[in-house]
Amino acid sequence: MSKIHVLNDKFENSGELELPASYAEVNPHNLYLYVKSYLAGIRANSAHTKSRAFVSGGGKKPWRQKGRGGARAGSTRTNVWVGGAVAFGPTNEKNYFQKVNKKQKRLALEYALAVKAQDGKIFAVDSISIESGKTKDAANIIKNLKVKDALIVKDLLDDKTLLAFRNLANCYVVDANEVNAYLVSTFSSVIIEKAALKTITKEG
């Protein structure tokens, strides 16, 4: 069953919530497609080689066509020369974007939440707000929950809470409207506000 642990203000277990049964029935392939698309979208397009059009020099024929006994050559910048161009090499103009439609994106999130809930790794709380904006207070929350790392899902993300969690390498804070299947899958635990959970399940 896809059950969510409900925690009180002292982060003690005070009950359970249940995700819609349809979440666990989603085809896992939707999660695969979305994660593949997400990773492709954030891929750094850094591999770049120069074709003959972009290598400087080589405009002059290095030697006459006939009479030397050697192979003919028209430029010092062809791909067979040291310092020459690269034939069919990668360029930073390549676009790795892979389209995933809204329905698949939604189904991927539903399945990711169902799997996480089945593992008992989703915790619902009334509110996660750090008025001080201090990382120390954010770290205490994670310590009290006794989790290795966590995705924090707020219904409405505020600057102070974002600031407090930003310096914690094992945490990431996201708005309910921005949460996605990749983030849910990446972190071992999900801490979600009840209002945020209502927002997410309402969209399904």
UniProtKB/Swiss-Prot annotation:
One of its GO terms (molecular function) is structural constituent of ribosome. Keywords: Ribonucleoprotein, Ribosomal protein, RNA-binding, rRNA-binding. SUPFAM superfamilies: Ribosomal protein L4. The keyword rRNA-binding applies. InterPro entries: Ribosomal_uL4, Ribosomal_uL4-like, Ribosomal_uL4_dom_sf. One of its GO terms (biological process) is translation. One of its GO terms (cellular component) is ribosome. PANTHER family: 50S RIBOSOMAL PROTEIN L4, LARGE RIBOSOMAL SUBUNIT PROTEIN UL4M. One of the primary rRNA binding proteins, this protein initially binds near the 5'-end of the 23S rRNA. It is important during the early stages of 50S assembly. It makes multiple contacts with different domains of the 23S rRNA in the assembled 50S subunit and ribosome. Part of the 50S ribosomal subunit. This is Large ribosomal subunit protein uL4. It comes from Campylobacter concisus (strain 13826). The gene is rplD.
